């Protein structure tokens, strides 16, 4: 027999998941989006207070994702898996953005800024990107060196 509860949080994650599936993060407050993202690393704990604390400290989701792993673990009690998941977010965004770019390999000035910008998403250390092209404007090589 199913247990009934008067817990106000009962079904909260499912409601949030449905809200996301129907609308994406456009209808979420920033703390709600972070709270939901944390569900996947912290499956049995209310992640709302943690999302608020992280945003109070780091101001933005970008700030949270750029925070040092050891700091996230020590100061917020995150497991290494939870901290690593946050660090993966910008890296996955970069991979996603790069994969959506035109693959015709023709360099044009209109897209050059977008191409370079995408390559630097999620990078926290100084780095250099090298793009090589031929005389016809075809990209031969583009990567972080």
How would you name each of these model-derived features?
Residues 1-72:
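Long, highly charged, low-complexity intrinsically disordered interaction regions
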Residues 53, 71, 85-88, 115:
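Generic beta-strand or strand-like secondary-structure segments
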């Amino acid at each position: 027999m199913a247990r009934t509860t008067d817990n106000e949080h009962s079904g909260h994650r499912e409601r949030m998941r449905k809200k996301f599936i129907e609308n994406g993060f456009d209808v979420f407050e920033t703390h709600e989006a972070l709270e939901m993202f944390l569900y996947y690393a912290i499956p049995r704990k209310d992640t709302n207070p943690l999302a608020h604390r992280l945003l109070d400290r780091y101001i933005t989701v970008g700030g949270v994702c750029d925070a040092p792993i050891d700091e996230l673990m020590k100061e917020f009690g995150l497991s290494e898996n939870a901290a690593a998941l946050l660090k993966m977010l910008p890296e996955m965004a970069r991979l996603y953005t790069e994969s959506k770019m035109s693959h015709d390999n023709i360099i044009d000035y209109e897209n050059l800024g977008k191409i370079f910008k995408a390559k630097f998403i999620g990078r926290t250390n100084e780095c250099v990107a090298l793009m090589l092209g031929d005389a016809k404007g075809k990209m031969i090589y583009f990567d972080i060196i």
